[in-house]
């Protein structure tokens, strides 16, 4: 993955967008990096970049581009996107640009969503200070969190999470962006009961599927996976359970499921006007 990014960065590719969504996403990240902007890939294409053997075997489609950046780079990134031929949704960006930007490649009808500083869906996590951990994508811990924060998790999200756990080790730190930081995950689950509730429930869902409900070819790499996902799930759950909880966590735990512990993601349309 890093070699690919460096090749794109040094190729000097400019002009029309590329037909392959992942190649185009890597091109945009490289161009942004060349201007001193902190921009990283997230969403489905980040999993293509991180687990290429798996996505190739399961024929996972590539289309939308999802990027992450920090607030201070928002304006410069917007200028870059327009210069590269993308159309900005001016109305949407004026209303929501402090947290999310939207562009589209009109010729290819390919959208680009840019999250600013944080992901806010069922749960929220900040990533502005994590953008330099890995070279191309958000760190593996954040990619895993982006799946495990989904309360009504679907099979695609489950398989994405399992693929990541099959290919990257658990570690206390980030290991230069090549490991899933347990410390990053437990920092959320030990301080926020809602995060704990959703993540532990989803880890249980992952374990159930990987231990008896996987369909042929769903988690196929064309080779042995680097790690056993069931062991990774068990180790992560043990770390979560073993991390001391904050006073705020303990107070919220007394309420439990009697109060909703997550947010319903808001759907907002795009007009590009």
Model-derived features with residue positions:
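The feature captures the alpha-helical scaffold/lid subdomain characteristic of nucleotidyltransferase
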Residues: 1-38, 51-61, 110, 116, ...
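Short N-terminal secondary-structure initiator segments
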Residues: 1-7, 73, 77-88
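Short low-complexity stretches enriched in small and charged residues
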Residues: 18-26, 66-72, 95-96, 102, ...
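A conserved hydrophobic position in a structured secondary element of the catalytic/binding core
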Residues: 42, 69, 138
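Short glycine-enriched loops at secondary-structure junctions
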Residues: 44-48
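Catalytic metal-binding acidic patch
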Residues: 52-77, 81, 161
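Conserved catalytic core of two-metal-ion nucleotidyltransferases
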Residues: 78, 82-123
């Amino acid at each position: 993955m890093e070699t690919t990014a460096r090749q794109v960065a040094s190729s000097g590719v400019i002009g029309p967008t590329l037909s392959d969504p992942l190649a185009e996403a890597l091109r945009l990240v490289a161009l942004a990096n060349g201007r001193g902007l902190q921009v990283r890939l997230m969403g489905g294409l980040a999993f293509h970049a991180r687990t290429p053997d798996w996505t190739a075997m399961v024929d996972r489609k590539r289309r939308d581009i999802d990027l992450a950046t920090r607030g201070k780079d928002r304006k410069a990134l917007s200028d870059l996107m327009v210069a590269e031929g993308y159309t900005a949704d001016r109305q949407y960006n004026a209303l929501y640009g402090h947290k999310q930007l939207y562009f589209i490649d009109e010729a290819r009808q390919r959208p680009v969503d840019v999250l600013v500083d944080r992901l806010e869906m069922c749960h929220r996590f900040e990533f502005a200070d994590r953008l330099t951990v890995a070279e191309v994508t958000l760190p593996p811990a954040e990619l895993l969190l982006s799946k495990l924060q989904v309360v009504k998790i679907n099979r695609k999200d489950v398989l994405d999470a399992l693929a990541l756990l099959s290919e990257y080790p658990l570690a206390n730190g980030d290991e230069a962006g090549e490991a899933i930081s347990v410390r990053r995950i437990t920092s959320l689950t030990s301080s926020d009961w809602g995060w704990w509730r959703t993540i532990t429930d989803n880890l249980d869902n992952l374990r159930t599927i990987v231990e008896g409900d996987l369909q042929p070819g769903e988690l196929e790499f064309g080779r042995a996976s680097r790690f056993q996902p069931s062991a990774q799930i068990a180790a992560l759950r043990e770390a979560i359970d073993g991390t001391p909880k904050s006073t705020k966590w303990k107070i919220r735990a007394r309420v439990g499921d009697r109060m909703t512990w997550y947010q319903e993601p808001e759907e907002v349309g795009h007009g590009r006007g």
